[in-house]
Amino acid sequence: MVHTIGFIKPDYPGERRVALLPKDIKELENNIAIESGFGREMGISDAAYLKAGAKVMNRKEIFQNCDFIFSLKLLQSNDYQYLRRGQTIIGWTHPYGSGRSFYENECIPRDIKIVDLDNITPRLFYRDRVYDLDYIPRNFVYQNSVIAGFSSTYHALMAYGLMPTSRTKVAILSAGNVAQGAYKAIAHFNSRIRMFYRKTMNEFYATIDEYDVIINGIQVDEPHVNIISKEQLALVKKGCLIIDAAAHQGRAIYGTKFTYLEAPIAQTEGVDYYCLSNSPSLFFRTASKEISKAFTRYIYRPSVDKMMAYLKKEGHPYE
């Protein structure tokens, strides 16, 4: 049986990325339906998607006719009315983070499955079980993470009104994709940069009061464990800007919440921070091309039955 994946425009504040481009709609094992205006941010008409073989529907029709719904970012409350029992929602759904309430309160009662396209460990969530989609390789969309580090750093500096110099001391936490993007951005200013890893974090903590800018690229796995705790925030240099390029609200840095384009800088414990969860959208043209290419290869092209087959496995508990 050939299934249809219905793509809706993300209704998340400031989100401009387009997760599927017409040029990538080829040799797919699933049918494609898009919400009218899906490609507008990229200047792509509905006609271009029709020519590529997709169907075009309005938002309500997508939910009514498609058992598999793709939303790049977490569904917002105005879409809950359209959800149908037994559907599957695919995207950056974050059931262990910002999407926990959505999964537990909206999906589980409706028997809705969730596919979280985490770059490191993509997973399928169903009721009280979690299944690692191990046919999707780690870092399958790493370029979006690099863009996240780059865009977060530039945007945060501009929003804060800070142009670093050769005297600016910068700490970058992690050496992963996000941190690489952050390094690429901050290195343009010839600042004094130190990079720290999980094994060298004690060195960072010993010098935390020296930095003018701290950029975090670490995702926190353990609940109730912060990379920078409340006590450590008290040691941070006055006027220091913390950029959470990993955008792990409340987890990486104590007390943080997501910030938004209209107000990208906030404070926790008197320290200014940046925590925009969709910063790659600032470079949406570049990010859209990378996302569409990677997601087509691993998500859109194989039959969605490949994901659903994991339900026959044991999985592990949702916690």
Describe the residue ranges of each PLM region:
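N-terminal beta-loop-helix "entrance" segment that forms/cooperates
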Residues: A33-K55
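Short acidic-hydrophobic, aromatic-tinged amphipathic segments that line or gate anion-handling sites
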Residues: K55-E61
